[in-house]
Amino acid sequence: MENSGKANKKDTHDGPPKEVKLPTSEALLDYQCQIKENAVERFMFQIKTLREKNQKYHERNSRLKEEQIWHIRHLLKELSEEKAEGLPVVTREDVEEAMKEKWKFERDQEKNLRDMRMQISNAEKLFLEKLSEKEYWEEYKNVGSERHAKLITSLQNDINTVKENAEKMSEHYKITLEDARKKITKETLLQLDQKKEWATQNAVKLIDKGSYLEIWENDWLKKEVAIHRKEVEELENAIHELEAENLVLIDQLFNCRLVDLKIPRRLYLTQAAGLEVPPEEMPLELPETHIEEKSELQPIEVESRDLMSSSDESSTLHISHENSIEDLQYVKTDKEENSCTEFGDTDMKYLLYEDEKDFKDYVNLGPLGVKLMSVESKKMPIHFQEKEIPVKLYKDVRSPESRITYKMMKSFL
């Protein structure tokens, strides 16, 4: 007794056993076992319900049979009573037909029960199959789906790497192909140039004396033409500058004449009306400088015919190379003459730019009359300057300057 008490004390001291953690595989197996047990329990419950229904149906059938027997007895009793009362007698055949109908009804009921049982068994089988499929898909969802997802991601990564490698290889092949094409074209051009050089060298070796001189003369003419064109350009630029200066000077002359048409009162009284100026008044004072009057004036428009005449005068300067030199000298002389007359004496006749006889014409113009002026060009003789052209003998073929080079031949190709 004491030992049993000690053992009970030890059990009480130890307390409830501690739960041991199982590995994942055993935990999955336990989980599946629990699922199976739950399914079996559900099936057992369904079977139990079906058995109860079957028992109820059997009880109902037995009750119906008892009721049938009671009804038959009741009918027989009624028949016997009716028979006793003189009613028509029910024969054996009628009873057999009624019994046959009743048995037929019972057989139909039993057949229906068998069909119902077959349907229930088939439904149970389908239910078990669907339950197994459900368990399989649940297991796949918990375990297999993760593994398959990892496989899918790894395969997608492999496909992406393969695509990237293919793109890189295609780009590399394109670059190499372009480099190869460039090298081939470069080598072909170099070979063509070399062959052209060799062909020209061979042609130079086999040239006769007449064609040799013609080639050399052609090269010399090209150089002379280049020099001539350069000189022509320089002369054209100089002519354009001189034309611009000429137009500026003509504009200044027009402005000076229009200003001088404004005649003062003292000059009008003494020269046009023939009156004497009173001694009290001061004599006419001329402006100190002609340049200051020009700076105070406003520019006045010149008619189109004057500009056309000046353009005609300038158009005569565009001539050949030798004539342009003489025109340049002629324009320079005109410029010097204009500058001399512009800064000459400041006399009264110079201010009017006319003689005293023509002074009345200015007076008759009226206060608002303006004399329109024009410029006319005049052809002048051109003196040609003979240039001494150095005479070169083309027969001296042995000199180093008269040799035909590859560049000279290449210019003809």
UniProtKB/Swiss-Prot annotation:
Report the SS bond pairs: none
Q: Organism's domain of life?
A: Eukaryota
Coiled-coil region list: 36-186, 216-255
Which InterPro entries does the entry link to? CCDC83
**Has the keyword Ion transport been applied to this entry?**
no
Give the Basic and acidic residues compositional bias ranges.
Answer: 8-21
Q: Which UniProt keywords apply?
A: Coiled coil
Return the annotated region ranges for Disordered.
1-22
Q: What is this protein called?
A: Coiled-coil domain-containing protein 83
Tell me which species this is from.
Macaca fascicularis (Crab-eating macaque)
